[in-house]
Amino acid sequence: MSLDTTEKQQLINTHQTHGTDTGSAEVQVAMLSERISRLSSHLQNNIHDFSSRQGLLKMIGRRKRLLSYMRNKSEQRYTEIIAKLGIRG
């Protein structure tokens, strides 16, 4: 369910805004989206894992807040990250 170092580094490299960027909103949204998709697949197999479901809802809320921040700051960055990750239809 968690990301190992190589997967995190790969996500950072694909979504960073400059060379040393590791914590921008884009990178955080990308990492949260990957963790959300992994946890969702875990919950499909383990229906009664309620503590993981609670963690999933917290991650979804955090991603939603970051995306709303990005939409308010820069509409262009928001639409780019949405298109890149494919999280909104």
Curated annotation (Swiss-Prot):
The keyword Ribonucleoprotein applies. InterPro entries: Ribosomal_uS15, Ribosomal_uS15_bac-type, uS15_NS1_RNA-bd_sf. PANTHER family: RIBOSOMAL PROTEIN S15, BACTERIAL AND ORGANELLAR, SMALL RIBOSOMAL SUBUNIT PROTEIN US15M. NCBIfam families: S15_bact. One of the primary rRNA binding proteins, it binds directly to 16S rRNA where it helps nucleate assembly of the platform of the 30S subunit by binding and bridging several RNA helices of the 16S rRNA. Forms an intersubunit bridge (bridge B4) with the 23S rRNA of the 50S subunit in the ribosome. Part of the 30S ribosomal subunit. Forms a bridge to the 50S subunit in the 70S ribosome, contacting the 23S rRNA. This is Small ribosomal subunit protein uS15. The gene is rpsO.
